[in-house]
């Protein structure tokens, strides 16, 4: 049985991470949250007051405090910068609203993409992000591109924030998601777009379990054929 690589891309709050985690657990695969890596770099920039021209300082800080993932007692994923648990810190609104400019820096993308490729080398991995199928793993055996309406994605993010105890306003989130979509799809380095061979799936009004079933069936078919 071949261990394949699954790339799940899509805009903010399209359900990538939720779906990827479930499928990884079902298949016994490793899940890599690439968004958390860019959020960690953004957290470093904000905490130190760094700007675009300080990219080398961000990279130095990442080298001193490497990003790592650990499992909590309940099975959830924890994100660390060095020995600091930043799992909740990188989900705060200030990080969310600044991650686009940090992730658009070519030097940051190059460093994190190299890290992601090293992790994926052995297969049996699911990665979600914005350029997994186009840049990070262009030869992934299965590529999925999830989309959903801005309204639905704002509702998902609102619910997520409330559950995590993060202050949220629906209309503000809606405007922020629309702005993030524009930034992500118009940046010069690795813009958000579906790979030519990706399966595009609109998750608007679709349950998480239905999305999981759709992708997992595709994955199992490829695994069985290998």
From Swiss-Prot:
Entry's Gene Ontology BP terms: nucleobase-containing small molecule interconversion; pyrimidine nucleotide metabolic process
Compartments reported by the entry: Cytoplasm
SUPFAM superfamilies listed in its UniProt record: P-loop containing nucleoside triphosphate hydrolases
A cellular component annotation (GO) from this entry: cytosol
Residues given in the record as ATP binding sites: 10-18
Catalyzed reactions per annotation: CMP + ATP = CDP + ADP; dCMP + ATP = dCDP + ADP
MF terms (GO), sorted A to Z: ATP binding; CMP kinase activity; dCMP kinase activity
Principal localisation: cytoplasm
Membrane spanning stretches: none
Keywords: ATP-binding, Cytoplasm, Kinase, Nucleotide-binding, Transferase
Keyword Heme: no
Its EC number(s): 2.7.4.25
Family, as annotated: Belongs to the cytidylate kinase family. Type 1 subfamily.
Protein name as annotated: Cytidylate kinase
UniProt lineage: Bacteria, Bacillati, Bacillota, Bacilli, Lactobacillales
């Amino acid at each position: 049985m071949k261990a394949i690589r699954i790339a799940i891309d899509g805009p903010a709050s399209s359900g990538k991470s939720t779906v990827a985690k479930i499928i990884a657990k079902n298949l016994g695969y490793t899940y890599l949250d690439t968004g958390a890596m860019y959020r960690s770099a953004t957290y470093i920039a904000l905490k130190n007051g760094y700007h675009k021209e300080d990219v080398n300082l961000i990279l130095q800080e990442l080298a001193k405090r490497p990003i790592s993932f650990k499992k909590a007692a309940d099975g959830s994923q924890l994100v660390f910068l060095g020995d600091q648990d930043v799992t909740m810190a990188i989900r705060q609104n200030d990080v969310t609203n600044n991650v686009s400019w940090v992730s658009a820096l070519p030097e940051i993308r190059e460093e994190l993409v190299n890290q992601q490729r090293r992790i994926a080398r052995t297969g049996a991995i699911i990665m979600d992000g914005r350029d997994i199928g186009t840049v990070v793993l262009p030869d992934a055996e299965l590529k999925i591109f999830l989309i959903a309406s801005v309204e639905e994605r704002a509702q998902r993010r609102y619910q997520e924030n409330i559950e995590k105890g993060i202050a949220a306003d629906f209309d503000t989130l809606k405007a922020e998601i629309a702005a993030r979509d524009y930034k992500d799809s118009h940046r010069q380095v690795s813009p958000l777009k579906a790979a030519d061979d990706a399966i595009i799936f609109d998750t608007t009004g679709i349950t998480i379990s239905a999305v999981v079933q759709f992708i997992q069936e595709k994955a199992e078919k490829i695994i069985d054929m290998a």
